[in-house]
């Protein structure tokens, strides 16, 4: 390493002499192409007037290869175990070109050297016993690596004798922020894991999801945004209590639509997850699980996706709507055992105690029984029983007083009906057609015809009237 530094020093002194001798010589046309290169070297050497005095101080702490930190040979760079604590951004050699892309150039230097030049130079100057230096071992979650063939300039650090801190070195500041972010995520993840161990199986299962670096901004990384997936059964209400709530809790309410779950007759419902921090006096975990009868089929619970900036360290209450399970209704059966239609109204059943049994009139009791052997008929009145007994004995006390008529009857109503046949009296008249009848049973039979005629069409009524008209007899034809 010391020989290489001495060679660099001799080369720089030779360049200084060449620059001082060049103006003395005559200017030739072929020197115009190299004029820009010499001016760039002269400006670069003038900016580092004190480099020679501090060269030995930085020589022990810097690698000998001018390869970029992010070149394709970063795994083969020489280094020592003591250099693991110093960011690689501060270990590049002095006077390296400024940040450039493959299509850009530096204002103070010539065109940027190619990657192949870096590779060959590093292979030639690489010591055999050096250990490879890996930046990924120091900061595994640092900012994403820069694209290939991009050099990093640290000319502003060559004049400093101090090591980089988090204020002057942006790489170290980014690593500290990422370390704080990782420690916060591990602490939050540990709290959730401890809470999950105390909750019954399949109650709450948080899963860390990996955020994509290309879609997460730097502001989100500093804020420590976390994404958790809580699978909460919709048939349970889980109350998780891990630590007391902070003095100034931050409430976060998110409306998340659960994914479509193909269940029989149960449509997917949106689930509202709201963080409600409550003061917890004791470190108990209480789980409220409603008991379901074994006859009901188990309802398929839709997973609930909870998203928030961070999980509070207090009590977390998840309120999940209960699934509606449509159980088949048993058919309605009447007291007599007859099945009723589901659309038919339910019959009204009156209680048996409300029924009032009507009192039986003592006068309507069939207390009069015929004493004739083998008869046993009963009657309400004694007169009816007396008339019945006359049928057994053959007694007819009522006789017709019409002149020349000697008929006798067992009942008085029969005698009255017989007398009308002699007189021609028609006591019973029809109120609709004014027809008269001698017997009441004849009038009743006639009234039935009027009741049936109301239900018939008009043409049938006309036909019935025509049938009532007696046709005149046809005259006998001459022989």
UniProtKB/Swiss-Prot annotation:
The modification Phosphoserine is found at residues 183, 248. It is found in: Nucleus. Residues 94-145 are annotated as: Disordered. Ubiquitinated; mediated by SIAH1 and leading to its subsequent proteasomal degradation. One of its GO terms (biological process) is somatic stem cell population maintenance. Its main location: nucleus. Residues 101-114 have a biased composition (Polar residues). Disruption phenotype: Male mice display postprandial and fasting hyperglycemia while female mice are normoglycemic but display higher plasma triglycerides. A zinc finger (C2H2-type) spans 368-392, 398-422, 428-450. Transcriptional repressor which binds to the consensus sequence 5'-GGTGTG-3'. May play a role in the cell cycle regulation. Plays a role in the regulation of the circadian clock; binds to the GC box sequence in the promoter of the core clock component ARTNL/BMAL1 and represses its transcriptional activity. Regulates the circadian expression of genes involved in lipogenesis, gluconeogenesis, and glycolysis in the liver. Represses the expression of PCK2, a rate-limiting step enzyme of gluconeogenesis. Belongs to the Sp1 C2H2-type zinc-finger protein family. This is Krueppel-like factor 10. It comes from Mus musculus (Mouse). The gene is Klf10.
